[in-house]
Amino acid sequence: ALVSRLMELDLEAFRRVERVNVEGALLTLAAAGRHLKAQGTGGDIVIISTKNVPCPGAGFGAYSSTKAACHQLGRIASLEMAEFGVRVNMVAPDAVFGAGPFKSGLWATVGPDRMRARGLDEAGLEEYYRSRNLLKARVTAEHVANAVLFFVTRQTPTTGATIPVDGGLPDATPR
């Protein structure tokens, strides 16, 4: 993760984040779309977005802006792929926490910068994210997986939609 205010943001560091979040999504959507179209049976694509799309944070410009572009690519893909029976939806979690074998290795990378940016230790960072949502929920990978499962089990005829998995962040998602 890259924590930097826009005025100090290194362009090459930004481009690394952009290549993963935007170019990676574009290439994946294009390849999956071609495959699912050729297969002729339709299908589902679920993009893991972020609460940072509707509610970015200061110092997280590279992440927030590139994930917003990724999210928008998903919305465009939903328009372009619907005629082939392909549904494209997004899941937008806040910070996802786990323990033991369910703890994401991502936090080893992004956690220290986020902790420094907020002046918190690991327990304090988790409490910060938990305490700011309406349900005071600790968002876990299982919560995110359940939202993905909702889309891919085709319980509703939905494409181009976003499910927030954030415990109810008042400023992140129109409710």
Protein language model regions, located:
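Residue(s) in the substrate-gating loop at a strand-loop-helix junction
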Residues: 50
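A glycine/serine/threonine-rich, flexible loop-to-helix segment
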Residues: 96-132, 174-175
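Catalytic Tyr-X3-Lys loop
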Residues: 7-27, 46, 70, 135
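C-terminal substrate-recognition "lid" of short-chain dehydrogenase/reductases
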Residues: 134-165, 170
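Active-site helix of classical SDR
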Residues: 29, 66, 74
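Short, small/polar-rich loop/turn modules that mediate ligand/substrate recognition or access, typified
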Residues: 82, 87, 158-160
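Active-site loop-to-helix junction immediately N-terminal to the catalytic Tyr of the SDR YXXXK motif
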Residues: 9, 56-64, 76
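Amphipathic alpha-helical dimer-interface segment in Rossmann-like NAD(P)H-dependent oxidoreductases
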Residues: 20-40, 78-79, 153
